[in-house]
Amino acid sequence: LFSTVAQGTGVGVVEASTVADRGELSTLETLPERTQNWTRFAPSIIHTSAGDKVRTAFTELTGKAPVLLAGMTPTTVEPEIVAAAANAGYWAELAGGGQVTASVFDRHVAKLEEELEEGRTVEFNAMFMDRYLWNLQFGSQRIVPKKRASGTPIDGVVVSAGIPELDEAVELIHTLTADGFPYVSFKPGTVDPIPPAVRTANAVPP
């Protein structure tokens, strides 16, 4: 029971529930193996003039609240909810799954710019495996980088619905960074793409 509770704390757990287990304790020649220590990743509270705030690696990196509005079609296709979340200090993603033509995207961006307070930014959630949308938004037509270049306050790209191969992912990060996006992230939809996403992160200097 306790071994489950102790996961991530760095505490060592020794089995002593049977006579045999307790007998082995008297002949141990090495220290018990400890669990992994994940405490350095835990959130913490910081005290500011504006009140207590939650501090995480995410808040340190982005300066935004530790809860985000993830891109999801159709929920965050429309700009109003995205702008409202961004204005409240949250990371807020415009869902690329609903930006199906350049004219639709133009209309949504115009409304977004109208609704956003000065200094606020949003992020764009792109569907990598949808070849039509990817080519429209970041491939041959590049409507999102073009908007960024024209001053639209989109400061991040979240690559979802598929993870590129390592070389392609690294090249994509360099390209999007050069396009003016300081934040490029990958959103694994299942367990299997998590290791490739981690390898990509390790391959790119912070």
Question: Residue locations for each model-derived region?
Answer:
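Active-site entrance/lid segments in N-terminal catalytic domains of soluble metabolic enzymes
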Residues: 2-4, 10-15, 21-206
